């Protein structure tokens, strides 16, 4: 019985972690849309910087280890 309870909480934790990750992806997408107009005018980015793009507003290019490996972060 203890095994089933532990397994349930393990599944719950995994579900919460995936929900958090999806939420962050949606937030990054929203921010990239907001900053998109500013970026095109200034020639810098708040998004992906894996091809040598310059980050805006003092943000730095960092390795994220996700689908887009290098992103500009505050």
UniProtKB/Swiss-Prot annotation:
Name under which the protein is recorded: U6-agatoxin-Ao1a
Tissue specificity statement from the Swiss-Prot or TrEMBL entry: Expressed by the venom gland.
Chief place of localization: secreted
Propiece span(s): 20-30
One GO MF term attached to the UniProt entry: toxin activity
Source lineage: Eukaryota, Metazoa, Ecdysozoa, Arthropoda, Chelicerata
Organism of origin: Agelena orientalis (Funnel-web spider)
Annotated Gene Ontology cellular component terms: extracellular region
Disulphides: 44-56, 49-61, 55-72
Subcellular location: Secreted
């Amino acid at each position: 019985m203890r095994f089933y309870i532990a397994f349930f909480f393990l599944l719950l934790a995994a579900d919460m972690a995936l929900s958090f990750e999806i939420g962050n992806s949606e937030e990054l997408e929203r921010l990239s849309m907001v900053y998109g107009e500013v970026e095109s005018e200034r020639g810098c980015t708040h998004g992906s910087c894996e091809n040598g793009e310059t980050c805006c507003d003092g943000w730095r290019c960092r390795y994220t280890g996700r689908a887009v490996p290098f992103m500009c972060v505050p």
